[in-house]
From Swiss-Prot:
<comment type="similarity">
    <text>Belongs to the UPF0398 family.</text>
</comment>
<dbReference type="Pfam" id="PF06908">
    <property type="entry name" value="YpsA"/>
</dbReference>
<dbReference type="InterPro" id="IPR010697">
    <property type="entry name" value="YspA"/>
</dbReference>
<protein>
    <recommendedName>
        <fullName>UPF0398 protein lmo1889</fullName>
    </recommendedName>
</protein>
Amino acid sequence: MKSIAVTGYKNFELGIFKKDADEAVYIKETIKRHLLPLVEDGLEWVIISGQLGIELWAGDVVAELKADYPIKLAILEPFEKQSANWNEANQLWASEVLEKADYHAFITKRPYESPAQFAARDGFIIDNTDGALLVYDLEKEGSPKFFYDRATQAKEQSNYYIDCIDFYALQEVVEDMNQTF
């Protein structure tokens, strides 16, 4: 596998309102634990769309991994000015992750017009990656459902790789990290 998409809940869907909240430490560690074996097996690219929450935390994780591994980060935003209506702290977070990216592009080269741009993003990213790592629990629907459904279709048609991190997996990392301290 050469490329993987990472997506999941937006931070506010998880009740997290700061990028550096305590919960983010556990989420980032969980993402790292799932990415690291893939990176060690030759994963070259992690692709995110620059959404708040899981995707930007994944961008932070990839930036950390770059110190020791030849991994690259691509940010493929669904449209121009995605962060224009975000608060200042979230805009800063997005720009910090963007600075760490090895590649950046817009899937539709215009500002937001309709939800179809999100569907276009999902389709483009799935069509151009070998798999997806999702922080998504089937028991708690949210924004990742649309990507998950489309990725599941790709898996059925072309053996697309899906690694879904649910809340139980997150809880295991929390417990493991708390035992370590």
